[in-house]
């Protein structure tokens, strides 16, 4: 499989390169970050670009490691159902959908910004879980059935989002996960039966 046909790896490489460049250029970081007032001024590309920059190396590593871990299986499904760019379209749509509730909530807040691929990565994780609900995931080295992880992840995201503290966009994680499941069901309705 070449780099250009392995869309998961291609997205990871682009994200790493763009993040590294943005860390070196505050102007680039500010141009790509999700900033609602800029969106209102017509910079709608920020609904996507925010997902290609990360706050620091740990943020980038965790998201890209997770994307790599689950992306291959999900990529296969979306490419088989939607064609060669199916996974890329799914991933980009997940970025947009995951940030939309945040935009609606924060659109008049000039102090708000968001970055990172977590919402789209959550979409990939939840698509995988829907495809393989009884597979075993390692949660801090503890083996957990994927379906149990999903329930715990949703519960935590709802609780953490309700707390409203910190710099993590839990709403994007939750909405991304829901989008991942709905998109998977839309292209493979029979998946619900298993």
Which residues fall in each region the model found?
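A detector for small-residue-rich transmembrane helices and their helix-helix packing motifs
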Residues: 1-194
């Amino acid at each position: 499989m070449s780099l250009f046909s392995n869309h998961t790896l291609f997205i990871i490489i682009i994200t790493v390169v763009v993040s590294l460049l943005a860390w070196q250029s505050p102007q680039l970081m500010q141009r790509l970050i999700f900033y609602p007032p800029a969106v209102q001024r017509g910079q709608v590309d920020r609904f996507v670009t925010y997902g290609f920059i990360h706050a620091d190396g740990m943020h980038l590593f965790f998201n890209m490691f997770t994307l790599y871990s689950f992306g291959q299986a999900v990529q296969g499904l979306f490419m088989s159902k939607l064609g060669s760019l199916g996974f890329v379209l799914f991933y980009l749509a997940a970025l947009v959908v995951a940030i939309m509730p945040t935009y609606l909530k924060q659109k008049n807040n000039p102090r708000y910004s968001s970055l990172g691929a977590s919402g789209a990565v959550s979409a990939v994780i939840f698509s995988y879980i829907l495809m393989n609900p009884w597979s075993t995931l390692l949660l801090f080295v503890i083996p957990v059935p994927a379906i149990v992880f999903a329930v715990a992840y949703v519960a935590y995201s709802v609780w953490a989002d309700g707390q409203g503290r910190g710099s993590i966009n839990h709403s994007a994680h939750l909405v991304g996960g829901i989008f991942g499941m709905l998109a998977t069901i839309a292209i493979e309705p029979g998946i619900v039966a298993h």
